[in-house]
Amino acid sequence: MAVGKDKRISKGKKGGKKKIVDPFSKKDWYDIKAPPRSRRARSGRRCHRTAGTKIASDGLNFRVFEVSLADLQNDEDQAFRKIKLRAEDVQGKNVLTNFWGMDFTTDKLRSLVRKWQSLIQAHVDVKTTDNYQIRIFCIAFTKKRPNHTRNFYAQSSQIAIRRKMREIMVKEAQTCDLKELVAKFIPEVIGKEIDEWRSQGIYPLQSTFIRKVKILKAPKFDLMKLMEVHGDYNEEVGAKIREASSRG
């Protein structure tokens, strides 16, 4: 039997072994700065790369990031609120953001739903004093009356309390700018006012929340106003946040 060469052993690889390069080594890191109404000025970091004529800082403008309010406020009780921040300007390695929406987590919404009660929802489109057009969604649930034994449904005539809910939301939003309005969302100022009204109104309510806020239209970018919103920010390290779609 003739002994020949084993081609599988003698054959070498073309080009040799390639050098492994870390893809993040060529990227720039930017600190995402949340407005100072949150307890953590630095809410996360974002990496981006400059390639050819494409500048990394230009690619960050108008990006929308989503972060849990619990991370911004250092308060786990606020974990059910999701805040959207939009990048408005890039200064050096800092990305200055502004409020761009709010929503509830799915598990929080499901936990509010109970048997033997009515869900009442209302929404309005309003314009703030600084010309932000926003859409506010409110939810509330009927509360059991003392003389009721089991269920506490609101009849069709009593569902008209939506009109009063809209009136309160419009009144609170039209008399302040975006910064002041966002400050009302976290302590649930509008929801508490609706609860106070319902004690004198048609039907008792419970679990009244502003569950969602959408920015429909923003005014023309003004750097001076953005700096007024941010003021002086510190270098506190924040939590990672993920990018969200700008739609919805």
UniProtKB/Swiss-Prot annotation:
Region (Disordered): 1-21
Cellular localization per UniProt: Cytoplasm
GO BP annotations, alphabetical order: translation
Alphabetical list of Pfam families matching this protein: Ribosomal_S3Ae
Record keywords, A-Z: Cytoplasm, Ribonucleoprotein, Ribosomal protein
InterPro entries in alphabetical order: Ribosomal_eS1 (IPR001593), Ribosomal_eS1_euk (IPR027500)
Gene Ontology MF, one: structural constituent of ribosome
UniProt entry tagged with the keyword Membrane: no
Subunit details: Component of the small ribosomal subunit. Mature ribosomes consist of a small (40S) and a large (60S) subunit. The 40S subunit contains about 33 different proteins and 1 molecule of RNA (18S). The 60S subunit contains about 49 different proteins and 3 molecules of RNA (25S, 5.8S and 5S).
Family statement: Belongs to the eukaryotic ribosomal protein eS1 family.
Protein's recorded name: Small ribosomal subunit protein eS1
Organism: Syntrichia ruralis
